């Protein structure tokens, strides 16, 4: 159990029930599904001023919506970006959410701390379980807690690779994080299964070491195994081993909420409903009820159904406001801003940040820029991770710039996978799409003249802040010169 001093700084939050990840591709199906108590939406895919009609209808029916962030990089060496924190806060307020969630991961590295180019991973990468990394993570979490108008929960991630020289198990790392910050946990049982296959970690041992009273809710998802490596794809059915880990967790505590994640390769709605049914059945067999109310918990036994939320922040025990439904109250933004400012200018963890920054930059550079593999890492596994990052990058670029696979047809994917290793992403996926198109044009590709013309027109329309020139050939020539001068 977390020490009493931390528990005294926690408040009760209601249960969530059974939910599913809301995605635009299945929005209509989710609205029609019976027994959906709540949904989770990727925060970066929601615009606060133009909420999707589907989410508005769900909210009107009383369905809770939780924003789930993927780009904050709380496990990174840098302090959380104030703009990203503000954006996450806006989404929580717009959706009337009772909490927000993010990941224990780093997503970018380099920059000022290492005096090297900033690199984007385009994916969630594992944090080393060291005291340095824990110190940095704790401060970053406190900064986020001070900036957000609702409680924060953080998720354990799936990993293909292991850091050398780790000093703690995952359970110990999470326990200390909760003890020092009071942050809530989003436990992904599919990620525990991934780490079992890929890193030889025992899910039962991880659950033994977790502070289960800190669990906000649970993720369940599917994946696939290839050549002895488990890929947490969120594009395949939930396998039995993942349900078995869910049953183990549910036998220890009542999960306040359980959510099914599916991000790709969406099946018919009936299949998703059957997966939700399997989750409910698993919980019932474990002697729990996912939709139990907080009031059902006995006063003599503290369980995770008595969902608690930390009020500690980066500057001590400043109480952060809770927001949700009709009882939501305005956040004292001035106090939160002062807390964020104080945390952002503090320097106790700076030596740890610099050590972590160098380690993360070396790893990410090896993964996305082809630099030498840092000492102690498994070269084969890093190769698997590098290929997975490139493949995901190709998939996301195809989504944000669907014209590219349309123009390039079957040439798109092999061309991008050839391009990616020598051209790391530095400015987001839209910039990545433009850089990829520019790279092809400078190489005189594609060979088909009509496809090359269409690609050139697409690039010219999007490559600058000003409208396309009346002389596109001259503009392309100037851009070519800029690129050549950078070499």
Curated annotation (Swiss-Prot):
Region (Disordered): 319-348
Source superkingdom: Bacteria
Pfam families, sorted: MbnB_TglH_ChrH (PF05114)
InterPro entries: MbnB/TglH/ChrH, Xyl_isomerase-like_sf
Residue stretches of biased makeup (Low complexity): 326-348
Region annotated UPF0276, chain positions: 1-285
Sequence segments annotated as region (Unknown): 286-487
NCBIfam families from the UniProt entry: PRK05409.1
Family: In the N-terminal section; belongs to the UPF0276 family.
Protein known as: UPF0276 protein SAV_2218
Taxonomic path: Bacteria, Bacillati, Actinomycetota, Actinomycetes, Kitasatosporales
């Amino acid at each position: 159990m977390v020490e009493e001093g931390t528990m005294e700084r926690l408040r009760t939050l209601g249960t969530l029930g059974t939910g599913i990840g809301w995605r635009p591709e299945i929005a209509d199906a989710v609205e029609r599904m019976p027994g959906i108590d709540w949904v989770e939406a990727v925060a970066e895919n929601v615009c606060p001023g133009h909420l999707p009609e589907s989410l508005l209808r769900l909210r009107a029916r009383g369905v809770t919506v939780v924003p789930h962030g993927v780009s904050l990089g709380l496990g990174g060496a840098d302090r959380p970006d104030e703009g990203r924190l503000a954006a996450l806060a806006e989404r929580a307020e717009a959706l009337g959410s009772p909490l927000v969630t993010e990941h224990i991961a780093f997503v970018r590295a380099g920059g000022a701390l290492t005096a090297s180019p900033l690199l984007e991973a385009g994916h969630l990468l594992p944090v080393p379980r060291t005291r340095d990394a824990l110190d940095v993570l704790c401060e970053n979490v406190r900064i986020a807690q001070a900036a957000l108008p609702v409680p924060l929960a953080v998720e354990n991630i799936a990993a293909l690779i292991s850091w050398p020289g780790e000093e703690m198990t995952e359970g110990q790392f999470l326990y200390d994080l909760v003890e020092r910050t009071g942050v809530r946990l989003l436990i992904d049982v599919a990620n525990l299964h991934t780490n079992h296959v890929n890193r030889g970690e025992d899910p039962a041992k991880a659950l033994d070491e977790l502070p289960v009273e800190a669990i906000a809710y649970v993720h369940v998802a599917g994946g696939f195994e290839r050549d002895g490596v488990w890929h947490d794809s969120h594009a395949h059915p939930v396998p039995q081993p993942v349900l078995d880990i869910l049953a183990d967790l549910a036998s220890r505590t009542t999960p306040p909420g359980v959510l099914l994640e599916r991000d790709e390769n969406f099946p018919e709605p009936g299949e998703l409903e059957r997966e939700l049914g399997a989750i409910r059945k698993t919980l019932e067999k474990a002697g729990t009820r996912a939709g139990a109310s907080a009031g059902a918990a006995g006063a003599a036994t503290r369980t995770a159904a008595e969902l608690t939320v930390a009020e500690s922040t980066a500057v001590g025990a400043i109480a952060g406001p809770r927001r949700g439904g009709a009882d939501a109250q305005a956040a004292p933004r001035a106090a939160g801003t002062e807390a964020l400012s104080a945390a952002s200018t503090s320097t106790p963890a700076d030596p740890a940040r610099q050590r972590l920054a160098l380690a993360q930059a070396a790893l990410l550079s090896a993964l996305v820029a082809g630099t030498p593999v840092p000492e102690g890492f498994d070269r084969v596994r890093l190769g698997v991770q590098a290929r997975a990052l490139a493949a995901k990058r190709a998939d996301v670029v195809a989504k944000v710039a669907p014209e590219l696979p349309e123009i390039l047809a079957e040439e798109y994917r092999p061309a991008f996978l050839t391009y990616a290793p020598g051209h790391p992403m530095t400015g987001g996926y839209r910039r990545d799409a433009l850089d990829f198109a520019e790279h092809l044009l400078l190489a005189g590709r594609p060979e088909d003249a009509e496809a090359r013309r269409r690609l050139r027109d697409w690039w010219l329309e999007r490559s600058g802040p000003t409208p396309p020139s009346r002389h596109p050939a001259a503009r392309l020539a100037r851009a070519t010169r800029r690129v050549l001068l950078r070499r």
